[in-house]
């Protein structure tokens, strides 16, 4: 054997070198396959022992006949290429010594092999031209070789060694369907079947034997033998599968056994009620052409011929993760559609690691942590119940931790344990919080410009069903969205019948609206100079006729009919009111009629115009719209018994709460009647509507304009011109014996409040006490410093600092100063807080609070201006004199020190 191997290796090596001289590089593996094909198609070639151009052309003719008979699928793609290359070598073997040596070596091997006993050849007629068996396999006992030689061809699965071969009669070759028989045999080839008791010899390419000499056999007899083997194999496989099914039925207690011809899945039935076992690899029925579905679940279990269970673990199919991820993103983690997907996945055996991988892939980081905490809590409760039951399923097994963190260990769980893991995982999923608006995705479903309305409604109903669980639950909401999210053409068709029909009526109304209809609308809108939406909204409106000519199509201002330009004026008849003259009744000025009876006052609007209705104003009737100066005698009362005179605004004003008190002009000027003074008060209706009127006193000798102090309480207030917002109450003025030596008030505005808010500026430096991480620091407020600086002496030694590459420049300079390694929390007396990273500099006389801290505190710097000074002077303030009417008030301003007994800003 060793000598044959050496000769064969020498032959292959010489052949490769010979081809290399021709500029062709080939692999030894490809040459082995080529000679295998030569042996299959030309079994006579190895037995003749001679290689010449004549015999090699006969090999080429066999290749061509095989190609014409079985087609290109049955012949290797490189067969003709290698045949041509070797043909060129044989033609030039006399000129090339290397080629001559290769041909001589091949003929020598063939002649030695041709002397082999024909009886031995009959046992090896299925062997390759170049044997690939190892030395160990050739040393096997003759009985084992006999068993191996009786196996089916290598392209079909091997049969069990324990099964006996049936010796049926050879069928008639003329009645055999060769293609159908080969397809039927190929269906039973499944690489995932469990291992058999005996395996075919290994394909050892590194220890190949010399080519075995084949005996001359009749091709017809060889085909008959192959047919009988295939039929025997099919029958045994059918019997094998039927026995497995019957065995499973007996194990589960179901006495109803299916027929042996019905090939079903051989997955093991779950042991626990309600637990659906994941389906493993499927077998193909001989009467169907469908292939098994792809196994997408991690843990599957199959049974071999001896009833032994085999478990397999596969990764998740990407389509499952993608579908679940899409449902979570569009409808939410707790939507009915999403839960249905989770429950369908949970019906299979998922290990704790599989659950964690699935949840981490489809949920956000926060939701994953929530699910994990709920899952662990459910597992703790289940583990306690298991401990009481004494079944040994602890917390580590349920969560896949500790000794069970390995996937191989989790695969061996009992089906009941898989059921507990499923319940804990799905219950944890249902406790995820609802985020966002569940109906947001539903409102986003809109009809396209060319999309049929029925397709749009179908998408809307499908999305609603996935969100609400049942589309009937939100049918009213879907109907509303079907109208609002439809395109303008469908909206125009539905609008007249919107409240008269249901969703099916909408579909019937819009059934004829398509792309051609949309195109016609676009053209009509372009010709009319309108948008499509405006065209649809206005097409059903009946435009009235012209007020002058009565014709439709234009307004009175555009009318060109001048026939009624100077119509004849009618002459009034006898006045129906006084019956004294010929005039119109609304122009009658008589106090009595023709009989001398007094006439009632005129009814109607007269010269004042129409009476103001409730929509004319938000506040009341417009009683004063003139901006001219009016005296108090022109003011009106709301009713004969009203105590106050109405004051109205002369301008359109908008007030906001941020504006504070504002003065509103009334257009009414003094003086008041003798021996009276006025009190300005707000109306009750204005206060209810959010407008606050400040009370004010009008002096008897005041001749200026009466103004109202008003403020918006909590919202924006609009005061139209002429609105009644306040009332003036006249009260008697009591004289006292005390004489006032002061000129009359005249037209001066509001008096002084005797209060002047200032911020005193002293020679002391503005300092501030702050707490950094609980330690008090006193520093100087430095608005010119960019950063906060703490002197080295005040810095705690255990607080870490880091050297920086920054240069601090001011009056002095510090190169590479040190800075706090972490952010410190600052806090003031009023519990305001923030974060800063101050610099630390040695030999600094005082701490400096820079703008990085002052900006967080929102400190503002203010200074007096000319406007404030003018306001003070207008209120009667005389520099150098006291405040007040008598100028006997305080001479120095009152500093604003703030409230010391409570936190926050303010003075009241």
UniProtKB/Swiss-Prot annotation:
Gene Ontology CC annotations of this record: viral nucleocapsid
Reactions mediated catalytically: dUTP + H2O = dUMP + diphosphate + H(+)
Coiled-coil annotated spans: 215-251
Residue ranges of the propeptide: 101-159
Alphabetical list of Gene3D superfamilies matching this protein: 1.10.1200.30, 2.70.40.10, Acid Proteases (2.40.70.10), Human Immunodeficiency Virus Type 1 Capsid Protein (1.10.375.10), Retroviral GAG p10 protein (1.10.150.490), Zinc finger, CCHC-type (4.10.60.10)
Keyword Nucleotidyltransferase among record annotations: no
Pfam (any one): dUTPase
Site (Cleavage): 100-101, 159-160, 213-214, 297-298, 523-524, 756-757, 874-875
EC number: 3.6.1.23, 3.4.23.-
Gene Ontology biological-process annotations: nucleotide metabolic process; proteolysis; viral translational frameshifting
Hydrolase among keywords: yes
Domain Peptidase A2: residue ranges: 777-853
Zn finger intervals (CCHC-type): 544-561
Active site: 782
Region (Disordered): 132-152, 589-622, 884-908
InterPro entries: Aspartic_peptidase_AS (IPR001969), B_retro_matrix (IPR003322), B_retro_matrix_sf (IPR038124), dUTPase-like (IPR029054), dUTPase-like_sf (IPR036157), dUTPase_trimeric (IPR033704), G_patch_dom (IPR000467), Gag_p24_C (IPR045345)
Residue span, G-patch domain: 864-908
Positions occupied by motif PPXY motif: 200-203
Motif (PTAP/PSAP motif): 208-211
Molecular function via GO: aspartic-type endopeptidase activity; DNA binding; dUTP diphosphatase activity; structural constituent of virion; zinc ion binding
Keywords linked to the UniProt accession: Aspartyl protease, Capsid protein, Coiled coil, DNA-binding, Hydrolase, Lipoprotein, Magnesium, Metal-binding, Myristate, Nucleotide metabolism, Protease, Repeat, Viral matrix protein, Viral nucleoprotein, Virion, Zinc, Zinc-finger
PANTHER family, per database record: ENDOGENOUS RETROVIRUS GROUP K MEMBER 24 GAG POLYPROTEIN-RELATED, IGE-BINDING PROTEIN
Function according to Swiss-Prot or TrEMBL: Nucleocapsid protein p14: Nucleocapsid protein.
Free-text comment about domains: Gag polyprotein: Late-budding domains (L domains) are short sequence motifs essential for viral particle release. They can occur individually or in close proximity within structural proteins. They interacts with sorting cellular proteins of the multivesicular body (MVB) pathway. Most of these proteins are class E vacuolar protein sorting factors belonging to ESCRT-I, ESCRT-II or ESCRT-III complexes. Phosphorylated protein pp24 and phosphorylated protein pp18 contains one L domain: a PPXY motif which binds to the WW domains of the ubiquitin ligase NEDD4.
Protein known as: Gag-Pro polyprotein
Gene encoding the protein: pro
